[in-house]
Each structure stands twice: as structure tokens, then as C-alpha cells.
């Protein structure tokens, strides 16, 4: 799609993420989030990196008490971001979106501005202090997400917009199984140095899957069977995986309750915090849907081929219209991987995947030891017909009944 100006591209991208009657943008929570300047944070090692952004650990917080305090330099500090070409063209578009977030329609359609009251500003200051106190008392560990300084300069604009969009989503998605946004970078989200202050992830599901696979391998050895004849360790490992699958479904259920489509559910985007709780993160491909924009069959005309092919529903791979049930398909592949401890379609190249999975309805083999409920759950959720797929509310109920299914480890492989 061609745009005459950068601002036109801006506006398109914002409206592509949020409908005109956006529930997310209308929420005041974003405006109430505390802010930090980059000079107040000392960052450490790189924890993870995507195509556009990097996530770094926060090693120190040096809170400035007043805005007019001069920033103190610290030899430990690393520059958070320094793009030479600040994209001032984004300002008007960003301001327009920020204004929409602080407007409500009253009687007769009259638009009223919502202003931050003194109590709101006081609350933001208290929140800053709470964040610092929790960090200093070792009650919380944080990370920042920022635009990579090494990406193609032509992609910086898109990266900044994506990060600003993600901030909007996380501001309203306050749930135990979704990564927690704690604060945002001071200033305009479309300027250099903007960042998200997030709870730190301990590891990802990708890492946890490797750990489970190694544990499962050890349990299959003869000595393990002698030491654990009733298979209690197998049962515990199975229950741990089912419990994690339930938490993922609960987080996705909450996301869908806002009519948000996630579009990139995979092990790399599912983490575990320092206490072992599941956290869904990376909302760069998420979009808010408006039912008024849907087709007669309940689908939407959205960008195709979005996400990771291994977990991509057929309709999105075929560039057909789709809805949030593509997330349920992706979940079925993640669930199967958690149960089988093998990547789905691990030996398929792109052409084979397209011919056999997308067009041919080939699916992974379901293990015989799984219960009838789990077998049916997988088959329903990876059905080529999106209407056959269980909702996440239904998935939570189905899986909750499975947590104690294996009464004896002998029923497991």
C-alpha cells in the first residue's frame, strides 16, 4: 500500500490496530501509568531479542524526585536507545491518538475531554515509588523493552509504532497470565528512547519444553522405573504441563474478552515469571476487532500470513478472512507440543507444510495414552473449520478436568 506521507502511514497503522470505537484507546489506564526517564534506569544484559525490539534486564533504578532535577550520570548506565533521525513526523498522529484516548461521548454525542486530575498525578508518583521499593527490596525484577538500535533505519518508524501499540494493549490487559506493564518511558511514544518497563520473565515455554523433554527422557530409563514404580514423577510432570496449558488458555480467554486477536501464539511468546506463573508477552501483531466491521460469517478482512507458519491457522495462511479463532488453532499446536514434547511438523519445509497442512488438513499424530477429552480437544481446535474450534473458556473447563486424569504413571509413556 502506498502512502503520500509518513503521517498517512502512521494513521493507517494505528487504525489497523484499533477500530474507530476502540475499547482499548478509550480506557484511561494508559494515561495513569507512571513514567521513567531513560537516565533513571541502568540496564544490564540482553534477555531476548525480536525483529524490532530487544528486552534488557534492569539492574538499578535511580528515581529523580522532581522533573527539574538534573540527570545524574552513572558509569554503570548503558544508553537505552539513540536514533539520530528522530521521527518528528509521528508527533501529530500520536497526539491525535492520545487525544482520542482522553475523550468520551456524553449525551447528544457531545465529546468531553478527560483531564488528569491532581489525584491521578499523585497516584503516578506513588506508583513510581512502589516500583522502586519493590525492586530495592528484591520483591520484583524488571526488564525494559526498547527498539533495537541495530535495525534498518527504514524500519525504525514501524518499530516505534508497534511498541507504542503494544503499550496500549498491555495497559488494559491486566491479568495474572499476561506480562505486566509497570511503567512507560517519559515523553512521546514515537520519539527516540521510548520503552516499556515490564516484569522480568524467568524463561520461555521454548526453554521449559526442552527441560520437560530431558526430564521425560530420564524417567524412561530402567533405573528410574525401578526407583519410581508407581510413576509419581511422571504424573507430576504431566500435571505441570497441563497446569501451564490451563494458564495459557486463561490468559488468552482474557485477551479475547476485549475482542483482541493475538495472532502470534507460540512457545517463544509464552514465558514463566520468577515464581513460575505463565505470562503471555509480545503483542506486536495483536489487533483489536470491531464487530461492526465483521463479515456476515463473523470473520474479518485482515492481513494474511501473519505469525509463525508452524502455528498458523489455514485460513490466515491462505489469505482468507479470519477471526480470533486463529488463536485457538495456534493453541492446539502449542498444547500438542506440550503433551508430545516434540515440535509439530518439525521435518516439514515451507512447501510441504503448505501442501499437506494448510491445504491438505494433515495434523500431528495424537498419542493413544491421552484421554478422550484431550483427544477431542486437539481435534476440535485444529479443525480447518474455525467454528468447530473450542473457545478458550471451553478449553479452560476441559483442561481443568484433566489435571488429575493419570491416576497412575503407568498410563503415561
Where are these regions (language model features)?
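Conserved short submotifs of the Hanks-type protein kinase catalytic core
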Residues: 191-204
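Activation segment signature within eukaryotic-like protein kinase domains
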Residues: 244-245
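Conserved activation segment of eukaryotic-like protein kinases, specifically the C-terminal portion
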Residues: 299-315
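Short beta-strand micro-motifs within the conserved protein kinase catalytic domain, predominantly
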Residues: 180-194
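Catalytic-loop of the protein kinase fold
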Residues: 256-272
Amino acid at each position: 500500500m502506498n502512502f503520500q506521507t509518513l503521517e498517512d502511514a502512521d494513521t493507517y497503522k494505528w487504525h489497523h490496530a484499533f477500530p474507530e470505537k476502540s475499547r482499548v484507546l478509550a480506557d484511561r489506564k494508559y494515561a495513569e501509568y507512571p513514567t521513567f526517564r531513560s537516565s533513571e534506569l541502568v540496564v544490564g544484559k540482553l534477555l531476548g531479542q525480536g525483529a524490532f525490539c530487544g528486552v534488557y534486564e534492569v539492574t538499578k533504578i535511580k528515581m529523580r524526585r522532581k522533573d527539574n532535577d538534573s540527570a545524574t550520570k552513572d558509569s554503570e548506565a548503558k544508553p537505552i536507545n539513540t536514533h539520530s533521525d528522530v521521527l518528528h513526523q509521528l508527533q501529530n498522529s500520536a497526539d491525535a491518538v492520545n487525544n482520542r484516548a482522553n475523550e468520551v461521548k456524553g449525551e447528544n454525542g457531545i465529546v468531553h475531554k478527560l483531564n488528569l486530575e491532581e489525584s491521578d498525578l499523585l497516584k503516578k508518583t506513588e506508583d513510581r515509588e512502589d516500583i522502586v521499593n519493590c525492586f530495592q527490596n528484591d520483591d520484583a525484577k524488571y526488564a525494559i523493552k526498547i527498539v533495537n538500535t541495530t535495525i534498518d533505519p527504514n524500519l525504525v518508524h514501524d518499530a516505534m509504532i508497534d511498541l507504542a501499540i503494544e503499550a496500549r494493549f498491555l495497559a488494559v490487559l491486566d491479568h495474572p497470565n499476561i506480562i505486566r506493564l509497570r511503567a512507560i518511558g517519559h515523553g512521546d511514544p514515537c520519539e527516540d528512547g521510548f520503552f516499556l518497563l515490564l516484569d522480568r520473565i524467568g524463561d520461555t515455554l521454548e526453554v521449559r519444553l526442552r527441560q520437560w523433554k530431558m526430564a521425560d527422557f530420564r524417567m524412561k530409563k530402567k533405573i528410574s522405573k525401578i526407583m519410581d514404580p508407581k510413576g509419581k514423577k511422571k504424573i507430576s510432570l504431566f500435571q505441570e504441563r497441563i497446569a501451564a496449558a490451563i494458564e495459557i488458555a486463561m490468559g488468552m480467554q482474557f485477551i479475547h474478552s476485549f475482542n483482541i486477536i493475538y495472532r502470534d501464539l507460540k512457545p517463544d511468546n509464552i514465558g514463566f515469571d520468577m515464581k513460575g506463573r505463565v505470562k503471555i508477552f509480545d503483542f506486536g501483531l495483536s489487533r483489536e476487532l470491531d464487530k461492526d466491521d465483521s463479515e456476515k460469517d463473523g470473520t474479518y478482512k485482515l492481513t494474511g500470513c501473519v505469525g509463525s507458519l508452524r502455528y498458523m491457522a489455514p485460513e490466515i495462511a491462505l489469505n482468507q478472512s479470519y477471526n480470533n479463532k486463529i488463536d485457538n488453532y495456534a493453541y492446539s499446536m502449542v498444547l500438542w507440543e506440550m503433551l508430545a514434547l516434540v515440535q509439530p511438523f518439525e521435518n516439514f519445509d515451507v512447501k510441504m507444510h503448505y501442501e499437506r497442512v494448510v491445504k491438505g488438513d494433515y495434523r500431528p499424530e495424537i498419542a493413544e495414552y491421552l484421554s478422550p477429552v484431550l483427544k477431542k480437544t486437539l481435534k476440535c481446535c485444529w479443525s480447518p473449520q474455525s467454528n468447530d474450534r473450542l473457545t478458550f473458556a471451553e478449553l479452560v473447563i476441559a483442561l481443568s478436568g484433566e489435571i488429575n486424569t493419570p491416576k497412575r504413571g503407568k498410563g503415561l509413556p
